[in-house]
Amino acid sequence: LFRSWSLQRLHNSGLTVAHEFNIRERIAFYEGLCAAHGGTRFEDYSEVRSHMNELMDQLDAMQRPRVLSHIDSVADNFLFLPDGSVRLIDWEYAGMCDPLIDLSMCAIYSYYDEAATEKLMQIYFGREPETNERKIVYSYIALGGFLWALWAVYKASLGEEFGEYTLIMYRYAKTYYKKVCLL
């Protein structure tokens, strides 16, 4: 509840920064790093990459609003202070972006399933999400999963291991692409 409320406050704050978080650019960036360090381990990578391009093209065509978005809305980045206030920390990925990306990132960082993601959207919107809103959130879940899978593959090439995280993120990409197609 507090995470959703804090994100909504951020998104409605009117604060701006001079840079954006561009998921297409970030995917290309980590894809390049992976290619330079041995490539990816996914047999169906070309197919999944094509699906991600499709989602990015659909989102671009929607011309969604850009507001200050945190991007790294993992539970550990929400500080609950003794006075009852909530503070967001760790702003390294923050930039101007579609605000619904923060809901998607919160869902994948928390390993939410579809039911928990639905509840998160209901809290954020204060109502049942519309089909188009659900499609946008699911698209960003797929894209976020794909991005963080690439990030983890690159980090693994440097000797860091993340256990099942890489596969969980890649699975989000594949699963939520299919969910978008059903909407």
Residue ranges and their predicted role:
Residues 7, 11-15, 128:
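Protein kinase-like catalytic domain
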Residues 13-71, 82-83:
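An alpha-helical support segment within catalytic cores of ATP-dependent transferases
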Residues 68, 87-90:
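Pre-DFG segment of protein kinase catalytic domains
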Residues 100-129, 142-160, 172:
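Active-site activation/catalytic loop segments of kinase-like enzymes and analogous catalytic loops
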Residues 174-183:
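Regulatory N- and C-terminal appendages and interdomain linkers associated
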